[in-house]
Amino acid sequence: MGNHEEFFLDYYINNDKRLWLYNGGTSTLFQIEEMKKKNKDFEKQLYNYISSLKTIVVLDEDFILTHAAIYLPKNCNDYDINQIVDMQTSDYNLWSRDNILKERKYKNYKIIVGHTPVKDMTKILVSNNTFYIDCGVVFGGKLACLRLDDMKRFYV
């Protein structure tokens, strides 16, 4: 789950769409309204689905996926992955922007993050086994995709 999904959850719970719309949710809200015409329960179903999403996902012993960042203490390699996951806060995983080029390597995991566009908006930035995949498409950069099976990169 990312910060824009959190905007939707806040909107649904508080019936206040200002923050979401201010941060680019207009077309998504319009599409939700259109879907509600076909299925009156669509918004509730979407809420239930998004509420079930995690802010951090661990795939086997290979990958850690999170929207913005993962908190890793200086001695992170002394902890197992479950302890690392327990240290996380959703605010940090959804909003942090202070890790680029300051990240720590955690065991042999490849950490995949987005949220903060990389400076060179034409390719994925890799640093210390962390892959920054936000290539700034919203600002005219590339839309990047990283296929985890073979780490092949695709750009549009």
Residue ranges and their predicted role:
Residues 4-5, 69-71, 117, 136-138:
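Catalytic metal-binding/acid-base residues of hydrolase active sites
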Residues 9-11, 75-77, 121-124, 142:
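Short glycine-/acidic-enriched loop or helix-start segments at secondary-structure transitions
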Residues 26-29, 86, 91-95, 138-142:
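Short, surface-exposed, polar/charged, turn-prone segments marking secondary-structure boundaries
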Residues 96-156:
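Conserved beta-sheet core of the metallophosphoesterase superfamily
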